[in-house]
A protein has these predicted regions:
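N-terminal acidic leader/helix
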Residues: 1-24
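Short alpha-helical "recognition helix" segments of helix-turn-helix
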Residues: 28-29
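Short acidic, Pro/Gly- and aromatic-enriched capping/linker segments at domain boundaries
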Residues: 35-49
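Short, acidic, Ser/Thr-enriched surface-loop or helix-capping motifs
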Residues: 52
Length: 58
């Protein structure tokens, strides 16, 4: 399975995966074979940043 391309759908997908799997974004990126920096940039592009206190993008 690939990560969604649309940034808003990607946000929902990533937050769901982080919650369900209990992993960090870098681990998720590695699992899906994507560069963490690109994932981070795509989500920052729509105004979301990772909050490690709750393990999600807000």
């Amino acid at each position: 399975m690939k990560m969604p391309e649309d940034p808003v759908i990607l946000l929902s997908f990533v937050n769901t995966q982080l919650r369900d799997k209990g992993i960090k974004p870098g681990e998720l990126a590695k699992e899906y074979g994507v560069e963490y920096a690109k994932l981070e940039a795509k989500l920052k592009g729509i105004g979301y940043c990772y909050d490690p206190a709750v393990n999600q993008y807000k």
